[in-house]
Amino acid sequence: MNKHIRAFSLPVVMVVSVLVSLLVLFALSLADLECQEYQVYHTRKQRILDLHSAVARYCIDSNMFYGQGDMVRVKLFDMSASHVVLTRKDWGLYEVLAAKSDYLPLSYTVVCGKARGSDLDAAIWIRDRSRPLSLSGNTRIDGHAYVPQSGINYTGVSGEIFHGDYVEQSAMRISSGQLPSIDSSSLNNIQNYRDSISQAWYFRNSQAEYIDHSAPTVLLYGKNSDTVYHLGGNQILYGDKLTISADSHLDGIVLIARTIAIEDGFHGCGQFFCTDSLLIGTGVHLSAPSGLFVSGHEHPYIAIGKNSKVEGYVIVLNGGKEDKELRYPSLAQQRGSQISGLVYIDGAAMLAGVVNGSAFLGDCFTQVNGRRCPGVLRD
């Protein structure tokens, strides 16, 4: 009886051993599969980080394209066999930078600012008109102030005394009678946009979509009666008098018109180029990378309403025309509004809100009870 039991136990032990071996092999296979999945995940993550690193490298060294045209292959590590392919193109006054991996079907596209327009580390630069700059109200200047040789006066306007911050002597610099020059190649790009209007076709919201910058640029035009637009990416919208309502959705497009009016409450992103005027309502938020540019008319003009924000550049070029009586101001920024970026006005500007960045002004003024006071900054 005992021999029979032992003889029967041997196959059972063998079966159990085989099952245990299979379980061990299955566990090892799962572990190996997890290692392979992690390796694929890690490789993909590293390639994505490589794309970001290549873009960051370009942002600190734009000379990497020198002699290479608009495309360059970047090798980030000596021991790595893979490269990142960078391509760039102008988009308004910005650049579109696309990074692609030659190892995996991955890409990364960003819109970034171009090279610094000036080597001057200026918070504000006022053209010397043989009169001092006057500060009134709650005006504050943080950073280097390039002012006329006659310096700065701290004064009261309409009974409101100066209660801002005094500018340290060490932060003051002497300006000149001419504004620092700007990159003329960017102006050529704008003219090229304007010359392409004949190729545009009529805009219809039902056909709107986001167009990637790797695709051909879509050229559209809007009628004066149109007010709602849903457009994004690689698209240019033309018109004579464009009106952008709060119901519109714009994501990084370029707009070209004689005049543009952005109605109260609009939130979006775009670069707006006009030849006459650009009117921003109240409570408007133009997120980065946006921009306002007016040039070409006898009296170009930008108005920014209360509680509005512009994240990007604000530029008005009037050819340096003299306007001593301030009949045709170039920029009127209302109190409570904010500009984050470059302000370049070769005419007269009223800065009554906040500017985070640099402001280059041909002249400045404030307005009290319908009267314009030249040479005064007042917040």
Predicted regions and their residues:
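Beta-strand/loop motifs with alternating small/hydrophobic and polar/acidic residues, enriched
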Residues: 2-128
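Extracellular/secretory-pathway and virion-surface proteins
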Residues: 29, 376-378
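Structured N-terminal alpha/beta-domain signature
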Residues: 34, 51, 218-221, 227, ...
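Short acidic-hydrophobic surface loop/beta-edge motif
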Residues: 70-77, 365-373
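Short, ordered "entry" segments at domain starts
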Residues: 88-236, 247-249, 266, 272, ...
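Long, well-ordered mid-to-C-terminal structural blocks that present hydrophobic/aromatic surfaces
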Residues: 237-238, 243-300
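Glycine-rich beta-solenoid repeat tracts in large extracellular/virion proteins
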Residues: 242, 260, 302, 329-332, ...
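Flexible, glycine/small-residue-enriched loop-and-beta-strand segment within the central core
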Residues: 284, 288-311, 320-322, 327-330
